[in-house]
Amino acid sequence: MAWRRVLSQLARSRPASTIYNELITSRPSWLLRGDVNGGGTLKNLNERYQSSFVGSLARRVQNLDVPSEASLLKEIYKSDPERVIQIFESQPWLHSNRLALSEYVKALVKVDRLDDSTLLKTLRRGMAVSGGEGERVGSSSALKSAGQATKDGILGTANAPIHMVTSETGHFKDQIWRTFRSLALTFLVISGIGALIEDRGISKGLGLSQEVQPIMDSKTKFSDVKGVDEAKAELEEIVHYLRDPKRFTHLGGKLPKGVLLVGPPGTGKTMLARAVAGEAGVPFFSCSGSEFEEMFVGVGARRVRDLFAAAKKRSPCIIFMDEIDAIGGSRNPKDQQYMRMTLNQLLVELDGFKQNEGIIVIAATNFPQSLDKALVRPGRFDRHIVVPNPDVEGRRQILESHMLKVLKSDDVDLMIIARGTPGFSGADLANLVNVAALKAAMDGAKAVTMNDLEYAKDRIMMGSERKSAVISDESRKLTAYHEGGHALVAIHTEGARPVHKATIVPRGRTLGMVSQLPEKDETSFSRKQMLAWLDVSMAGRVAEELIFGDSEVTSGASSDFQNATKMARAMVTKYGMSKQLGFVSYNYEDDGKSMSTETRLLIEQEVKSLLENAYNNAKTILTKHSKEHHVLAQALLEHETLTGAQIKKILAQANSTQQQQEHAVEAPRKTPAAPSSPAASAAAAAAATAAAAAKQAAAKAKGVAGIGS
């Protein structure tokens, strides 16, 4: 602001011509090159220099002829400079009068509004445009032209107009466009560089340029595999062939090229393949079906070729493909071409024009029905070995194998655990042992006990206990009688599975549960077993009706009815156990829509008859053994969880107490008539004996240990 004050003082004290000549002759070059340097401060100085110069131009013509308007403005200026500014800006025809312009500039300087004048800024831009030659050669030429025009008296006339330049309204849009154009160009450059790198390094990035390396030393042996003796026996032939191929080929025979291991998850298919490699002592190539697919077309087929090429160099060897159904699924004409390329290449490598000698391919899958028929035909996968879930002896062996790594107490009986885990796979048994070990560690025990194994088994089979669930006393009592009815009918029904455990502790989605386990592995079920299963299923609802009445039954038996109906319908439609329908199998998967109305009606009548008979049988048993039912329910309310052995012990004690009471009542009836005093003594003695027996039974019942509490 200092330079502006200097110009204001000069305007008041010196003639305009002198100021103009001094500015023109002594102007510094750095003021005229403000645009070149680009600094914000220099640019402002240049603009303000031009503004002051315009004021000097106006004051330059003070000694010329003064019209009446200019004289009037001069007189007004002495008393009211603001009025001069208002008059000049409101009268456009005064803008061409040099004397009036001089008075206007002096008034702006007087009131210190020189920088805020819109009119002066417009005049300054007009001088810059009219004096420029192309792209802003310099501010000095504009100032010279403006000064010369002022000297000649033609500034603001028709021959030398004041040009108006408006700022571009599309400046922001142009900036956005330039930014977008720069980003697009950058993206194209990066994409091009990436494509070049990808073209040269895609094989290295996807691992295609690296040769597949086998596992040379497999530590797994057949002795480590338990519970699948039949599968091990079939795979031993492969081991003998890999050890001595000439033994089998000198007679003209050919060993199978491929072995397909089929079975449920967790049965040890992968472990069997590793055991084959460990026993034979040959290189072992392992891969998964999903590893062949990639986002790039043709990568899967390329990887199959690389795998078999590496295997040929190390023949004899084993190639193991886990989850082969990922690439070996049945082909569909609607599938994309790249989806079939991998499978086609695998088919060619297994049995194509070029024979692969000494390469044994072992594949594993859980869904053999989904594989392509061309893949499983003889010549590719000649042998299909089923690896089922282990039987009771196999489960015991698997448990022993896993328990070798765990500290166990002397009370552990693995045969009991094996018998109580039907349908468990090897992976399930390994998980059971691990859960038991973690439970023992959490309890601070020094070894895994039988209770830990039982806890792990119940947690896997029945779900975790929900002891924090808030249940009313009425609901607990109803659940105890409901589950007690199931257990009691199972004990007194011929053909029913033995009761393993009864509990009223909520597990999973149930409020209580009675677990029944077979004494041995079962491959089929008899009619007697199925009818007994129906009786046990109906016992829960029967118990609720007998104890609480018809109006107090609950929805807790819904799952029992659903399972019983499913079993009864299977007996009628699948197993030929209905005299009315005969030995005919009916497809009921479509809800009977494929059958006639008469047939469906007959099936439903037979199913209803089976369920009604089961209901009546359960009602007869619970009515006959009502006292045992009450004792068992009270024991469940007290201990919450009871094992099968504990339930039998409680029922035996209840029966013994009842028999003693019956004998005590019948004894006086059989005794001959005697004097009143001896008879009274005998009666008192019998009553005392009965009371003592009842007290003893109650004490023994309280001594039963609760497992789930």
From Swiss-Prot:
Q: GO molecular-function annotation terms?
A: ATP binding; ATP hydrolysis activity; ATP-dependent peptidase activity; metal ion binding; metalloendopeptidase activity
**Where is the stretch described as Disordered?**
655-682
Biological process (GO), any one: proteolysis
Q: Does the keyword Zinc apply?
A: yes
Entry annotation: catalytic residues: 483
For this record, the Gene Ontology CC terms, alphabetical, are: chloroplast; membrane; mitochondrion
What residues span the transit peptide?
Answer: 1-15
Binding residues for Zn(2+): 482, 486, 560
Q: Where is the composition biased (Low complexity)?
A: 670-682
> Any binding details for the cofactor?
Binds 1 zinc ion per subunit.
Q: What is its main location?
A: mitochondrion
Q: Which InterPro entries match?
A: AAA+_ATPase, AAA_lid_3, ATPase_AAA_core, ATPase_AAA_CS, FtsH, P-loop_NTPase, Peptidase_M41, Peptidase_M41-like
Q: Which UniProt keywords apply?
A: ATP-binding, Hydrolase, Metal-binding, Metalloprotease, Mitochondrion, Nucleotide-binding, Protease, Transit peptide, Zinc
Per the UniProt entry, the Enzyme Commission number(s) are 3.4.24.-
SUPFAM superfamilies, per database record: FtsH protease domain-like (SSF140990), P-loop containing nucleoside triphosphate hydrolases (SSF52540)
SMART domains referenced in this protein's UniProt entry, alphabetically: AAA
Query: What are the required cofactors?
Result: Zn(2+)
Q: Where in the cell is it found?
A: Mitochondrion
- For the ligand (ATP), the binding residues are 263-270
Q: Where is the signal peptide?
A: none
In terms of PANTHER family, this protein maps to: ATP-DEPENDENT ZINC METALLOPROTEASE FTSH 4, MITOCHONDRIAL, METALLOPROTEASE M41 FTSH
Q: What does this protein do?
A: Probable ATP-dependent zinc metallopeptidase.
- UniProt name for this protein: ATP-dependent zinc metalloprotease FTSH 4, mitochondrial
Q: What organism is listed for this UniProt entry?
A: Oryza sativa subsp. japonica
Q: Which gene encodes it?
A: FTSH4
